[in-house]
């Protein structure tokens, strides 16, 4: 479910900021080892690589990296959107958007230790859920049967410098191949700033979907 927030817990008169939200770990990318050319060496990467090789799974290293990276991106999206829905919160911070190599090793970034992209998500896609203005959707559960009706409640997080005048909203439902199954529009409206604002809701009967998606 995304139909929740922590506003009830934040009815206090001091600012509350979430500290080091997320921290999802990604499997090491052994292709980064040659980049460690200075006094800091990737000994930990070598330990992971040698262990994987000893267990006969070194050929799966990139699969582990890609799958854990994709899951991390989804989890960061979920965590950040929950922070944004909690409009009484004054802000949040991540441990870092790049891997942390001090005091041990924390591969929690969408960037590598050298601030290079890991190829997991583009800046544009990341800013769809982490930016001054973000479209949010509340829904009651994650898994549906085809005799269910999906209902989504749209919200706009807007901390941009100005309100959104005559904002137009369109929604659509796609299948696993990206084919649009249903689309529609919410009413054109003004959206304020410095807050989270309801933009309306829509429903879609799922009885036309005959296979898992």
List the predicted regions and their residue ranges.
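Substrate-binding clefts and catalytic carboxylate motifs of secreted carbohydrate-active enzymes
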Residues: 2-166, 170-174, 181-183, 189, ...
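Surface-exposed loops/turns
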Residues: 146, 211-212
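Buried hydrophobic-core signal for structured, non-transmembrane domains
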Residues: 150-156, 201-204, 213
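Exposed beta-strand face motif in extracellular beta-rich ectodomains
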Residues: 167, 212-213
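Intrinsically disordered, low-complexity Pro/Gly/Ser/Thr-rich segments with frequent PxxP/GP/PP motifs
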Residues: 180-211
């Amino acid at each position: 479910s995304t139909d929740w927030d922590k506003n009830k817990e934040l009815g206090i008169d001091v600012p509350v900021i979430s500290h080091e939200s997320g921290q999802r770990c990604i499997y090491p990318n052994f292709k980064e080892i040659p980049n460690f050319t200075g006094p800091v060496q990737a000994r930990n990467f070598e330990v992971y690589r040698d262990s994987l090789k000893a267990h006969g799974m070194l050929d799966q290293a990139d699969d582990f990296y890609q799958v854990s990276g994709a899951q991390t991106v989804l989890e960061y999206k979920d965590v950040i959107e929950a922070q944004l829905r909690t409009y009484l919160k004054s802000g949040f911070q991540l441990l870092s958007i790049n891997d942390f190599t001090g005091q041990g090793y924390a591969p929690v970034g969408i960037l590598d230790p050298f601030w290079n992209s890991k190829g997991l998500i583009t800046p544009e896609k990341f800013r769809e859920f982490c930016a001054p203005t973000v479209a949010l959707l509340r829904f009651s559960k994650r898994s549906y049967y085809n005799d269910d009706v999906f209902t989504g409640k749209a919200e706009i997080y807007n901390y941009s410098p100005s309100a959104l005048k005559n904002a137009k909203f369109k929604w659509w439902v796609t299948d696993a191949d990206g084919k649009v199954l249903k689309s529609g529009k919410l009413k054109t409206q003004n959206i304020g700033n410095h807050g989270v604002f309801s933009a309306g809701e829509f429903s879609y009967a799922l009885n036309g979907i005959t296979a898992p998606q």
